[in-house]
Amino acid sequence: LPNIPTHIALAFGIWKAGGCYVPISPRVPRKNMMEICECVSPSLVVTNRWKPEGYLSLSSSELKTISEEYPEHMPPDIMAVPNLANCSGGTSGKTKVIEQDMAAGESDEGLKTWFAISGMRFEMRQLLAGPLFHGAPHSVAFNGLYCGNTLYIPSCFDAKAIVTLIKKYKIEYVQMVPTLMQRIIRLPNFNPEDLQSLEVFCHTGGVCSADLKRKW
């Protein structure tokens, strides 16, 4: 699924049921999708594109319809270990799936470490500026939700749209890759004051030159 609220809710549902979830790009080629399915033997594939043959698959709308038939009370907790697996092309070019051998959620100690590394704190206004199938945006998004942050999810990662959202919603926390940082400062009529609400800014996903850091 793309970055939509259903994706977030589904991840929590999978963890609540003790499952491991594998976020995949909504643009993944059919061949790679089948390789992933063969590797992990999924109990369920949720996709709004084509459904892989031989595997139980639902669209997000079908999932919502089925969910309405279930009672509202929460099921008992089941520890989800591993909680997450990421896909990688590896050196061979063949799709590989790498499990994250840890439980879903964060301990108090884990959040303290996260605060020290990321600068995040509780109840911030946060913008998700990367796809959930990538490790860093995924970690930032869910750790933010664990901290009670309000998470704003843009429909695209266009530089102008990102600046507009930061200004409109007075975003306090955002993580970006250097390529997006570069696109933003090169925008025509870019006004640094549009970003004045930002209190914490993190970058990852590539080398960030000293010159680009100084400009920011």
What are the roles of these predicted feature ranges?
Residues 1, 22-35, 149-169, 180:
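ATP-dependent adenylate-forming carboxylate-activation enzymes
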Residues 1-27:
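Conserved AMP-binding/adenylate-forming
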Residues 2, 50-53, 171-215:
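Adenylate-forming
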Residues 14, 87-91, 126, 132, ...:
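Conserved S/T- and glycine-rich ATP-binding loop of Class I adenylate-forming
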Residues 34, 61-82, 108:
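Flexible, low-complexity linker/hinge segments
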Residues 83-109:
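Conserved AMP-binding A3 loop
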Residues 108-125, 133-173, 187:
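Conserved AMP-binding/adenylation subdomain of ANL enzymes
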